[in-house]
Swiss-Prot record:
Keywords: ATP-binding, Cytoplasm, Cytoskeleton, Hydrolase, Nucleotide-binding
Name of this chain's protein: Actin
EC numbers, comma separated: 3.6.4.-
Protein's job: Actins are highly conserved proteins that are involved in various types of cell motility and are ubiquitously expressed in all eukaryotic cells.
Record-linked InterPro entries: Actin, Actin/actin-like_CS, Actin_CS, ATPase_NBD
Amino acid sequence: MEDEVAALVIDNGSGMCKAGFAGDDAPRAVFPSIVGRPRHQGVMVGMGQKDSYVGDEAQSKRGILTLKYPIEHGIVTNWDDMEKIWHHTFYNELRVAPEEHPVLLTEAPLNPKANREKMTQIMFETFNAPAFYVAIQAVLSLYASGRTTGIVLDSGDGVTHTVPIYEGFALPHAILRLDLAGRDLTDYLIKCLGERGYPFTTTAEREIVRDIKEKLCYVALDFEQEMQTAAQSSSLEKSYELPDGQVITIGNERFRAPEALFQPAFLGLEAAGIHETTYNSIFKCDLDIRRDLYGNVVLSGGTTMFSGIADRMQKELLALSPASMRVKIVAPLERKYSVWIGGSILASLSTFQNLWCSKQEYDESGPGIVHRKCF
């Protein structure tokens, strides 16, 4: 492989797709992982109507489209739509010919084997990639933080995972998945605001609430105390201007929505919170490596962007861990994109160049080659 050809790095999340070139410090393209199809054929006269729209274009035309997310809870469930997203990524966003660049894709922890094979097949057969690699998202986040051992709490839009990693290898028996992430918090905030008399119903309005969540929500260090403060004074209230000019006031919802990460019962879920899930994940690991994991808890993904989340994690994990344990929460500023950044770092390492799975190897061995080359 020639040095001058940059590898493409694509991180496909449930909510957003991040894509760009290896060696860059940030993704060039970040767009919603959605595919939209017209609700009614032939309504838009003379629009030169397409049968499908992807990403921002689908988002902006959502009034006349049915929107679908091909990635649910981090796992690809609709391959035809996924292919459309990849096509859009190569040709419209990055404007590259995929047959000229090695491609690094990311996958969810515990991704079914058949899924990796399908990914591999599409990259080689549909897009004719010269070389391909698939890496686990959380492992890339850990690399981006400059570590090879630690536990990653990766929480995005569709799913949250705790992934213990030792010397660069994820420990599958100790990986835990929590089906509670950004989208659920947005829905819960919609419910909280609805109770206050601010109804948000359409998919378009849901995007407004997502923005409110991202701009105004935070994690309280002491939830009960914060609820009391909010009840006694208006010091925690903030106002938000809706697109139509109406101004709404948001109070305890600011910290009630993200609190669901620590108390899933708020959403009616019988699951452990992110602090307890992290603890359980560490507990499933060998005694000898637990100290290294407690000392390197790395946050990753957009849902870990709430202010106050690291301090709260520190407090909760300290309460659960053995008495003499040193707990350190690492919250890199760029954690929203750390999976992509880790991929960019990995794919540009000189030592990585002989790890790619080549088209020739694929032609000789078939899709199963991915299990031997990528782990």
